[in-house]
Each structure stands twice: as structure tokens, then as C-alpha cells.
Amino acid sequence: MNLKAKIRGLKEHPLVQVLANNGGNPRTLVLIEPLWGIPYNLIAPFATLYMYTQGVTDVQIGLILSVTMVVQVFFSFFGGILADKLGRKFTTMMGDFFGWGMACLVWSVSHNFWLFLAAAVLNCFEQINQTAWYCLLIEDARPKDLVGLYTWVNIGGLVAIFFAPLSGLFVNSYSVVPVVRVLYLVFSLTMIAKTIITFKFCHETRQGKIRRAETRNVSVFQMLGEYRHLIPSLLHSRGVLKAVAVSVILYIVNIVNTNFFSLYVTQRLGLSENLLAVFPILNAAVMLIFMVGIQHRISVTKFRVPLWIGLALYGVAALLLIFSPANSVGFVFLYVFVSAVAAALVNPRKDALLQLNINPQERARLNALIMASTIALSSPFGYLAGWLSSVDRRLPFAFTLVLFVIAMLVICRVQEPQVEEKDA
């Protein structure tokens, strides 16, 4: 009876209820997300070292980031148009196949700056998938379940992180380059499989069918021209602008952390490369405990206070990293712990906050416009972070501290969105 009671209690958990109440696309996309998350997290701790070990410098890494972000703006603009004309499902499949499946194939054979740049540019094709994937995930879901769905998306990625020690073990035995080459090849195969599953088990959303019918006889260039009407509506929405501002700041921070954390802890703090696979595990464990055990106890309709607290914790974490003594694993572990709690508070809410502030009828093109704007505004900072790292590896993280303070000031002026029960 005790076991049955526990199973019954598990079924009644708010996160389980979110999946139970949102079948079809949301459930399918959440369940197959590990096909992206597992290989991505196996590679992520070593991706920068993979380039650095093969002669790509800090400045070149920053240059790759900035160049690809410019290309991403182009793909992002067309992402919303393609999501309307071709449908959310087909556009998602295209982005997964070319932006990840083919890009990872090129990464698996890259050995110089130009090949790494080519792979990164090909990966920009994934931007057309960003808009379509989010539309496919949420358009047939209930608005009040958005934080829960975004929490599930985060959980899918976090569970995948527990596979990260495998890459650490392989790197310890065979070195970075050959291991990462094989992992990129595996990543290519899993993304092709993900594309096939999306084709088989997902369906076009109601809004996607409407937009596809409305745009059937409208040219791509005419739809591109219609952005001139969408841009003013975007600029006049204070709620959207504030949500976009926070998204831009966190996007820049993610660029810094993803590309320069591994260099900082190995090259400046002197920690072993093998630990790079351990840090994501701690991060994932803390976030999972928080999301499963605590997240649902925080009202899903409250955004401002949890976001502000999360950003404050991010700032504390940045200070811990900046002032970490050399060879001090404890400081870095504490940094990871605090960052994980911050991410659990911030990530689902900043995504849901943005979606609740935009017009559902124009979600695809508005999301594309917002994504393009986010990348465009962030693009100079990849090179800047690379230059800062070349001067002093602490400087990129000091820069993120300033960004967190700015984001906190923005959140202070955000109004709580009205969450309705009707379908999105």
C-alpha cells in the first residue's frame, strides 16, 4: 500500500499533471529532448578546448561567435516566415537536420579555424528551428502550464547531463580531440533520429494550420516586408521590451559561460580537465532537486520576485568565480551550486514571461523577430568576451556581473502577466 500511495502521489505531482494535461506535441517534444541534450552535454564541457587544443586562439573563438551570430540574425528573420509558410513541424525538422545533424558532421572532422567557422555557420541553420520548435511546443498547450512545460524542457536537458562523466572518462583515457570527434559524429546520428521521430509523432498546431493557409499565396519577400508593421507593435509593448531586454542579457551571459568557463577554470585556476565533466553533474543535480521538489511550491503566476532573486544569485555566483583562489575546487563547486539555483528560478520564467506578453496570432514572426534582435544585439559581445579573456580570464565574468545588475533593475519594473485558462 505504501508503494501504491507513493506511485499515486507521483502521478499527482504538478509536473506530471502538466504532461498528462498536454499530450501530443508538448509531451512528444519533451520526451525526445534528451536526443539533443545527452550528446550536447557530453560535448559542451570540452567544445572550447577541442578548438583551443587544435590551435584556435581566444580571439579566434570570439570571432567565430560574433560572425555566426550575424548569420544567426539572417536565419532568425526567415525562421518565423518559414514556420508560417511551411508549418511548425516541417520547419522544426529542417532545423534539426541541417542545423545539428549536418553541422555536427562537419565539427567531427574540423581541425582548423576555417572548418570550425564553417561548422558554426552551418549550425546557424538551427535558428530557423528555434521559433518553430517553441510554437510546436506551446501553441496547443494551456497558458497556465507554460512554466511547467519550460521546466520539463529544462529537466530533459538536466537528466542528459548525468551522462557527462562518460566523456570525462574517455578524455582521461584517449585525450580531448579523438573523443570529441566521435561524440560529434554520435550527435549527428541522434539528431537525424530526432528528426524522424518528430515527423512520425508530432502534428501541425492549430495556429500553424491557420497561418499556413493565410500565407499560402503570399510571397516570402512580401512577408519579410510585413515586419515593418510588426516592429512598431513590438517597440510599443513595454512588457515585451522588458522581457526581451532580460533575454538579451542572459543570452550574452550564456555566451560567456559556455565558451570561457572551461578555459578559466583550467588555464587560470589550474583545475584538471577531467573536472569539466563533473561540474555539469552538480549543476544538473541541484537544478533537478529544485525544479522537482521546490519549483511547484512557487506560484507559477508570479514572475518578478523569483526572477529578481535568481538574478541576484547569479551575481553572487559570478563574484565567487572571480575571487576563486588557484586550485580551489571548493570555490568552483560553490559557484556551480549557486548558479544552478539561480538558473532553476530564472530559465523557465524568463521564457514563459516572454511568451505571455506576445500576440499568439503572430507568435511565429514575433518570436523570430525577437530572436533575431536578441542575437543582433548580442553579436558584438562574443568578440568582446574573447578579447577580455585574452587580457585577463576573470574579465568576462566581471562583465557578466554588471549585466546581472542591469537585468535586476529591469525586472524591478516588470508587471506580472495575466495568466488565463484558455488555450494558447
Predicted stretch roles:
Residues N2-P26, H203-V244:
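Juxtamembrane intracellular "pre-TM" segments in multi-pass secondary transporters
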Residues E12-V71, G239-P280:
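Helix-loop boundary and gating motifs at the non-cytosolic
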Residues V121-G157:
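Cytoplasmic helix-loop-helix junction between adjacent transmembrane helices
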